[in-house]
Amino acid sequence: MSESTVGKPITCKAAVAWEAAKPLSIEDVTVAPPKRHEVRIKLYDTGVCHTDAYTLSGVDPEGAFPVILGHEGAGIVESIGEGVTNVKVGDHVIALYTPECGECKFCKSGKTNLCGKIRATQGKGVMPDGTSRFTCKGKEILHFMGCSTFSQYTVVADISVVAINPKAEFDKACLLGCGITTGYGAATITANVQKGDNVAVFGGGIVGLSVIQGCAERGAAQIILVDISDKKEEWGQKLGATAFVNPTKLPEGTTIVDKLIEMTDGGCDFTFDCTGNVGVMRNALEACHKGWGTSVIIGVAAAGKEISTRPFQLVTGRTWKGAAFGGVKGRSQLPGIVNNYLDGKLKVEEFITHREPLAAINKAFEEMHAGDCIRAVVDLS
């Protein structure tokens, strides 16, 4: 932002995860200037996501420490490296954990939103040149998911950032960097739900509720939210669900699959798993209509978990598929989703149930694990 910082290291506050299963520590970190095809962003707000907690817990096989977590952030471009043409200093931006280079086999296929260009280095917590831009107390600090939004400044690859309408406030825009877009896109892009479809959504967190939004926008006939917490019924109704089922309160001998097949005259056209529970994933598939029902897996299961069903479920016409970031291409499609929010077509602010300053980010993690939190937003300013 200021010419006095361009090309120079910046010292700022960040929440550093020094080791697994320990609280984050607020530290002074040094953020190096961006190199070729890199962008340095002054971040204003970040969401706290279950993926961050999963890595912090130590069970993530790709987790490495020390690291600056966070992948749901929005801010302003402070400076750019040589060769950057897609954003400029002063642009309002969202960091992208799913990049879009437009040149790799994945991007050119037109069949996926996945991009292979920097996957190898991103998974190791470093920039494309194999090094980090963060240091603290003389130690190199790793990046996370190509974003590291738990810092007042971050450096990302130019293919991992997108300029958005500056009318979108950062505390809302940041949530479109993961949770809301993941669910909304799964309904509108991956599944491509159509008017009159019957759908069931397993899991009433921010992703599941955003699936409901997308299905409602498309004119689905029945949108059934399935959750073991009765508190989620009201949330579902707010976003467009037409029914709610708590599988723990069904009559003895009645399974959730039985119930959904009964409610939808033979099964759902689409089901969505937003839980990461492999048992739920099986139920979601088997609640699909014979001949054409499709189940979309969105929730990320714990390491080592496997899905199973009887092959006959697939032979008789059901489809199992998955979605990352809702099938949304970050650089080419996310700005349009931001505009949908600004036009009042997509609810975002309603999902913010808790707010904390950076100094209290550990409290935001505690709130996330509580039943009444949909999304906690951390103010980085």
From Swiss-Prot:
Reaction catalysed by this enzyme: a primary alcohol + NAD(+) = an aldehyde + NADH + H(+); a secondary alcohol + NAD(+) = a ketone + NADH + H(+); S-(hydroxymethyl)glutathione + NADP(+) = S-formylglutathione + NADPH + H(+); S-(hydroxymethyl)glutathione + NAD(+) = S-formylglutathione + NADH + H(+)
Origin superkingdom: Eukaryota
PROSITE patterns assigned to the protein according to its UniProt record, in alphabetical order: ADH_ZINC
Coiled coil: none
Residues at which Zn(2+) 2 binds: 101, 104, 107, 115
GO molecular function, one term: S-nitrosoglutathione reductase (NADH) activity
Cited CDD domains: alcohol_DH_class_III (cd08300)
Protein name: S-(hydroxymethyl)glutathione dehydrogenase
Origin species: Candida maltosa
